[in-house]
UniProtKB/Swiss-Prot annotation:
UniProt key word Hydrolase: yes
Name the UniProt record assigns to this protein: N(4)-acetylcytidine amidohydrolase
Taxonomic source organism: Shewanella sp. (strain MR-4)
Role summary: Catalyzes the hydrolysis of N(4)-acetylcytidine (ac4C).
Pfam families the record matches: ASCH (PF04266)
Length: 103
């Protein structure tokens, strides 16, 4: 089970503003549960910047990503597909972690 989660620094402001409300992860990073509070740090330097509460975790296929997923990531669908392919090249099975910022 994950006890913290990291994001690339480029997503920090989107998370803090509430514009980014989901993250797509591989199976290794999907072991969280609804109601769990996770400290959030930057991937680059492990700097804590907030806490999030997990709302739900659902499997989703890369080929089934939609404009709604992209909007929840604060991206266009082509941007989202490109970013996912950079992070998880060739991976079809993803897990959507929906979250909210803990104030």
């Amino acid at each position: 089970m994950l006890t913290k989660i990291t994001f690339f620094e480029r997503f920090e402001q989107d998370i803090l503003s509430g514009a980014k409300t989901i993250t797509l992860r591989d199976e290794a990073e999907s072991h969280v549960f609804a109601g769990q509070i996770l400290p959030v740090s930057t991937f680059e330097d492990d700097r804590w910047f907030c806490d999030i509460e997990v709302i739900e975790v659902v499997p989703v296929l890369f080929s089934e990503l939609t404009e709604q997923h992209a909007a929840q990531e604060n991206m266009t669908l082509p941007e989202l597909r490109r970013v996912i392919q950079e992070i998880y090249p060739g991976l079809e099975q993803l897990f959507q972690i929906r979250f909210c910022l803990v104030q």
